[in-house]
């Protein structure tokens, strides 16, 4: 049985040198090396020194709380089953997702927002592509504009992260510094507002969200200060490492993760869903981005997975 390792800690990386026009080349290279090392060792790191204003981070969490404070019937008015086609926008109540056989469904509830694609677009209604659903109760609070403003900030931040990751790839792979740019072509960028309510019945099979790997390329997680629960599995010691919450920090995820009331906002870069992603190391492995993500959803999502399974048969 794996246990929590309170001695180890995932790295914290300050990327301010990447954003400063006066930073030395050595300082920039240190950030690149540190990020590359963190991805190899953990697949996770804390990120600080970014240019996201503290008030924007607080506002994202405030929007999270505004939505989940709505009565259940008002949240269900923007239920994910009302989204167009297979766009999967809107509210998911607790009990939708099960990550492993033998576990109970996750207790989390989510509100999903993505890239805004209107009904006239030829791709509207295809997988993870379509218009967002917005609760009318929060219109006067500027909810939609506030959420989309935060999403735009996350897209700019993930571009900075991708550029840094590209510069950290092995020189023998002969990759350019813009090798990840195709991911940002009409990208799938689901952003999930998450609420983990208190677990009233204690059961070893019950989690807010069980251990899993994220489906896409890069995830940016904003956690509420003063909370805990997220852990990273560290294979060398076969132990779970707690992820601390930094007041002005984000958790960046490339790999495995395991997640009182707790709120968080997760931004996922899945990339261009039509892109044929090829392994950069020359191994020949390749996959269509959208097909890979759909298969993972079928494996773990109840209502959403069943819908995808029917449409793919």
Curated annotation (Swiss-Prot):
Protein function = 2-oxoglutarate-dependent dioxygenase; part of the gene cluster that mediates the biosynthesis of eupenifeldin, a bistropolone meroterpenoid that acts as an antitumor agent. The first step of eupenifeldin biosynthesis is the biosynthesis of 3-methylorcinaldehyde performed by the non-reducing polyketide synthase eupA. Oxidative dearomatization of 3-methylorcinaldehyde likely catalyzed by the FAD-dependent monooxygenase eupB is followed by oxidative ring expansion by the 2-oxoglutarate-dependent dioxygenase eupC to provide the first tropolone metabolite, tropolone stipitaldehyde.
Q: Does the keyword Metal-binding apply?
A: yes
PANTHER family given in the database record: FE2OG DIOXYGENASE DOMAIN-CONTAINING PROTEIN, OXIDOREDUCTASE, 2OG-FE II OXYGENASE FAMILY PROTEIN
Ordered alphabetically, the record's keywords are: Dioxygenase, Iron, Metal-binding, Oxidoreductase
Q: Give the metabolic or biological pathway.
A: Secondary metabolite biosynthesis; terpenoid biosynthesis
Phylogenetic placement of the source organism: Eukaryota, Fungi, Dikarya, Ascomycota, Pezizomycotina
The enzyme class is oxidoreductase
- Recorded source organism is Phoma sp
Query: What does the note accompanying the cofactor annotation read?
Result: Binds 1 Fe(2+) ion per subunit.
Q: Which InterPro entries match?
A: DIOX_N, IPNS-like_FE2OG_OXY, IPNS-like_sf
Q: Where are the transmembrane segments?
A: none
The protein here is known as: 2-oxoglutarate-dependent dioxygenase eupC
Q: Does the keyword Magnesium apply?
A: no
Tell me the ranges covered by the Fe2OG dioxygenase domain, including all copies: 187-284
Disrupted-gene phenotype: Abolishes the production of eupenifeldin.
Residues involved in 2-oxoglutarate binding? 274
